[in-house]
Structure formats: structure tokens, C-alpha cells
Amino acid sequence: WESASRSMARLDGKVPYIISGGNHDYGYQKSENGRTKLPEYFPFERNSCWRDCLVADFPNRNGDISMENAAFEFHDKNWGDILVITTEFAPRPDVLDWARDLAGSEKFRGHKVIAMTHSYLKQRSAEYTKNTSYKITPQTSGKDFWDKFVSISPNVVLAVCGHTGKPGDFEDAVAYRVDKNTAGKNVHQMMFNVQISGGGWEGNGGDGWLRILEFMPDGKTVKVKTYSPLFGISPSTKHLAHRTGACDQFDMLIDF
């Protein structure tokens, strides 16, 4: 926790970064229960950039207010109003109700909504995750996240997650799909989890790969790129810093 906090401190006061709690952020090792140190190490007041964009929150499993279930509002001259809603790992049914009601509220129903959660899509196949084997309870699945929040919220345009993956090709660390919501609009859904790239579970921790989303000035195109600053910083490896395969770079056309 202290190491993660020190690393993220470089962004405090500079970037309104948003955290989506994962399975290893709960319990003793992997979500044996709902105990977490997220409120202790990442309180809302630690980053001054959250002051003007944090607009809503919902208590975590211990009744504490934290980054686990929170919403952030952004305004852009080309993209208009954007609301980012992040939820805890395997969110409780009440959390999905809160997220759905918030997205559909009078204040935010005209916003483009980006939904974040940890476990949502399986690697490569992009199937929705089912109920997990983790002991944390109550919990919902990726399929529930789609059925009970994303698909029935007409203004959710993008959902992003991590979590799944297996040693193998880079394609085993990513997933992408587009589905129609109940309003007939396209919803882009993307999983990115490169923790096993560069040596497997006990390897190099992902070789620094980042998934970059560039929101273009036309207000409807999002360019997706995959870049590693670890490779990019060295003249001897910078030629490896950009992945250019079909699963690494593509455009998303936002339907709103």
C-alpha cells in the first residue's frame, strides 16, 4: 500500500486520476472479505485535482466513503459533459443501483458516461465474467454490470475494466466488444490487463504497457493506442515502445 501510494503521489496535484479497486485490494490476499485500506491511503483530500470534479460517492462495504464508488465530472469544449463512474470489485447490487440512478438522474442524464470496474470482460473472447470464486459477499458479475447498469443506461458510451488474463500472447491480456444498449446505441467495452506480459505471473509486471485513449477534437472519435514508456525511454528499445496490432490500436466512434 505504501509503495502504491508513493508511486501515485507523483500525480497528486497534477492529474485527476481515478482508481478502480481490484480483487487484491480487499481481504488479506484476494478478497476474502471487504476490508480494504483504500480509504486510508487514497482519501479524497489527498489529490487537489479531485476537488473540482468529484461529484458523487457511495459507501464501501465497510460504510466508509472512498474512491471505490465515486463519480467525477469533466467538461470539454469538443466533447461536452462527461461523467466517469467507478465501482468497487465485484460491486454489491446496491452499488449498481446507485450507478444506474446517478447516470440517469436529471443532473447527469445529458452527460456521456464512462463506467469503470475491475472485473467485467474475459480476456480475448470478451465474454462477460460470471460470479467469481472469491469469498467477498454480496457480489455481482460482469454480466450483472451489463444487465443492471450499462445496458439500461442510455448515456453510458464506454465501459473499461482489467482483471482477467493468462500467460501467452498479448491478445490474452486484452479484450474489446461493442453491443447495443436498450436505447439502440453502441456501447464500447474494453479490458486491458498486462500484468503477466513480460514473464508471466512472476515476471516483469507488464513491461510498462499503457492503454492510451485519445479523445479527438471531432467530439466523437476515440483513438486507442498501446505504448510502453519503459521501452520508450531507452534508445535501444524505443522501437518496441508502440504496439501496432489490430488489438493494440483502433478507433472507437462514440454513439451519443
Language model feature labels by segment:
Residues 4-6, 55-62, 76, 109-112, ...:
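Residue-level recognition of alpha-helix boundary/capping or hinge positions
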Residues 167-256:
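Binuclear metal-dependent phosphoesterase catalytic core
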Residues 23-28, 88-93, 119-124, 163-168, ...:
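Solvent-exposed loop/turn segments at secondary-structure junctions
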Residues 16-22, 87, 114-118, 137-140, ...:
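Active-site neighborhood of phospho(di)ester-bond hydrolases with catalytic His/Asp-centered motifs
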Residues 93-97, 106-157, 171:
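Active-site-proximal segments of metal-dependent phosphoesterases and phosphodiesterases across multiple
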